[in-house]
Protein backbone atom coordinates (compact mmCIF):
# COMPACT_ATOMS: atom_id res chain seq x y z
CA UNK A 1 0.00 0.00 0.00
CA UNK A 2 1.29 3.45 -0.93
CA UNK A 3 1.36 5.91 1.99
CA UNK A 4 0.86 9.61 1.33
CA UNK A 5 1.17 12.35 3.94
CA UNK A 6 -1.00 15.39 3.28
CA UNK A 7 -0.31 18.64 5.13
CA UNK A 8 -3.57 20.48 5.77
CA UNK A 9 -3.32 24.26 5.33
CA UNK A 10 -6.75 25.19 6.71
CA UNK A 11 -9.35 23.69 9.04
CA UNK A 12 -10.42 21.06 6.50
CA UNK A 13 -10.28 19.93 2.87
CA UNK A 14 -13.19 18.45 0.93
CA UNK A 15 -12.72 14.76 0.17
CA UNK A 16 -12.97 15.10 -3.62
CA UNK A 17 -10.40 17.94 -3.56
CA UNK A 18 -8.04 15.91 -1.36
CA UNK A 19 -8.04 13.15 -3.96
CA UNK A 20 -7.18 15.71 -6.64
CA UNK A 21 -4.47 17.41 -4.57
CA UNK A 22 -2.81 14.03 -3.89
CA UNK A 23 -2.82 13.22 -7.63
CA UNK A 24 -5.16 10.25 -7.16
CA UNK A 25 -7.55 11.71 -9.77
CA UNK A 26 -7.15 14.33 -12.50
CA UNK A 27 -10.08 16.55 -11.48
CA UNK A 28 -12.53 17.29 -8.70
CA UNK A 29 -15.26 15.74 -10.85
CA UNK A 30 -13.30 12.50 -11.13
CA UNK A 31 -12.86 12.61 -7.36
CA UNK A 32 -16.62 12.94 -6.89
CA UNK A 33 -17.22 9.94 -9.16
CA UNK A 34 -14.68 7.84 -7.26
CA UNK A 35 -16.29 8.70 -3.91
CA UNK A 36 -19.78 8.00 -5.30
CA UNK A 37 -18.63 4.54 -6.41
CA UNK A 38 -18.01 3.55 -2.78
CA UNK A 39 -14.29 2.98 -3.30
CA UNK A 40 -13.15 5.51 -0.67
CA UNK A 41 -12.92 4.90 3.08
CA UNK A 42 -12.45 7.57 5.73
CA UNK A 43 -11.20 6.29 9.09
CA UNK A 44 -12.11 2.76 7.99
CA UNK A 45 -15.72 3.44 6.94
CA UNK A 46 -17.01 3.79 3.38
CA UNK A 47 -17.67 7.49 2.68
CA UNK A 48 -20.21 8.46 0.02
CA UNK A 49 -20.34 12.22 0.73
CA UNK A 50 -18.26 13.73 -2.05
CA UNK A 51 -17.56 16.98 -0.19
CA UNK A 52 -17.08 15.39 3.24
CA UNK A 53 -14.82 17.64 5.33
CA UNK A 54 -11.53 15.89 6.04
CA UNK A 55 -9.66 17.25 9.04
CA UNK A 56 -6.20 16.70 10.54
CA UNK A 57 -5.82 13.26 12.07
CA UNK A 58 -8.12 11.50 9.63
CA UNK A 59 -7.02 8.70 7.28
CA UNK A 60 -8.41 8.21 3.76
CA UNK A 61 -7.92 4.86 2.00
CA UNK A 62 -8.66 3.64 -1.52
CA UNK A 63 -7.27 1.32 -4.18
CA UNK A 64 -3.98 0.56 -2.40
CA UNK A 65 -3.41 4.15 -1.28
CA UNK A 66 -3.49 5.48 2.28
CA UNK A 67 -3.58 9.26 2.85
CA UNK A 68 -2.77 10.47 6.36
CA UNK A 69 -3.94 14.06 6.88
CA UNK A 70 -1.83 16.17 9.24
CA UNK A 71 -2.07 19.75 10.44
CA UNK A 72 0.44 22.13 8.87
CA UNK A 73 3.14 23.36 11.23
CA UNK A 74 2.72 26.93 12.32
Residue ranges of each PLM-predicted region?
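C-terminal structural segments of small proteins and small subunits
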Residues: 47-74
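Generic structural motif recognizing short loop/turn segments at the entrances and edges of beta-strands
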Residues: 2-4, 38, 65
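A detector for short, charged/polar N-terminal pre-domain segments
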Residues: 1-13
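A basic, amphipathic helix-loop patch mediating RNA/tRNA/ribosome contacts
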Residues: 13-56
Amino acid sequence: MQDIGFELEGEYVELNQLLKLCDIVDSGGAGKALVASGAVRVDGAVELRKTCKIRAGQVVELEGVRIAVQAADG
